[in-house]
């Protein structure tokens, strides 16, 4: 095979099992990857300089097609209620078929890092069939210095072949699409999907598996830090589409990252070196920092419609999917951290997209309440972030990221609770979903309200406010906040039909109670008592 580009010649594609490849293009940067993607007609050039690719039938993740090898090493470590299993034999058959499928093809390889803290960093080598996928993952992960490449030996490997189609009978999977992880072999195989987000989430899943054993809390969150040392850092938990990227992009604070972080004894650190922002209905006025990246050379836009003549993106066009995205390096954001690291957080924000419209825009949580709501992970799946999802759907995604958590949620919940207590962190639940009614009758929470409330929480003033006890959920809600209309802080006052509000709130409370039954045997009594019904009875 022909090797083009800088790489470790002693540990090349053969080490991953490849044979008879036509060529491997190693560690290409944006200009060369643009040339390759455009000449192969994988993508188009948008006005402003970004590259635009479409992903076919898969415009979001395929969580039901994700599998973990069940072997002696994972049998008692993986949360099998939440993770599909395949046998080592099925994975090996799949691996051999992947390698056979790759014969005679040209692949692109990137040698990258997952984790900004060198103490917990993972070397991730990613082989892709598409040049634009190679640029995507290069943007999203941490790029090593060129001097490090000659001796680079990966800790994990990803092989992404969208043209490969799995055989459920042969490979033990569900469809022609497969995302299979063998933690023992430190190998991820992605086939049958061109959705680039599968690659970054595979690295995240791997880190979520290995880091708890090192005393590090892996988190599906964005993070930023105050510009002065006194303000501290903040973590924003939330499922895709709840506002993690938008709300952590704040010009008055330094951005660490928008999606994946770790919390160790030294502080918090980004897992990535880029951002993967939703662009549907993106506007220059509302989100200027993110909008500016769509006009930069090097940005990858995914499933964004562009004018066939002018090549101007139409961010309001959801004809392919609501889940339009752009992927760009962190240094495209002017206020991004150069190190991806910060001290221990002073605030934790749990973002929920309440599809019922009965939760307040912000609530202050005790440590026990924080663990309860972290394990509950109530939100709404937003249209487009998963295949087949067309409208908001109320759901409970434990740890605000169940699809990426290989271990039992209590593993992550206990780590989080201990860290909150140790560092005296203020915790907040923020509703970025609906107010004045649920989906169809209410409206989305105004982003200006959310930003004002977050500003008060992060500068420390909100913690000193007067609070009331919410009669349905039990947590503390501020009575008033400067710059926010008082009625919006009390959800029932935003509903025209008060009786419908009471019925809807009671229905959601029951959903919380029913969902948490699966965790009751894994948590202490104070956490069991932190749920809505238990607090209402106690009151």
UniProtKB/Swiss-Prot annotation:
GO CC list: cytosol
Amino acids binding substrate: 61, 195, 201, 325
SUPFAM superfamilies the UniProt entry points to: PEP carboxykinase N-terminal domain (SSF68923), PEP carboxykinase-like (SSF53795)
Domain of life: Bacteria
GO terms (BP aspect): gluconeogenesis
Binding site for ATP: 201, 220, 238-246, 287, 325, 450
Record-linked HAMAP family: PEPCK_ATP
Protein name (Swiss-Prot/TrEMBL): Phosphoenolpyruvate carboxykinase (ATP)
Origin organism lineage: Bacteria, Pseudomonadati, Pseudomonadota, Alphaproteobacteria, Hyphomicrobiales
Gene name linked to the record: pckA
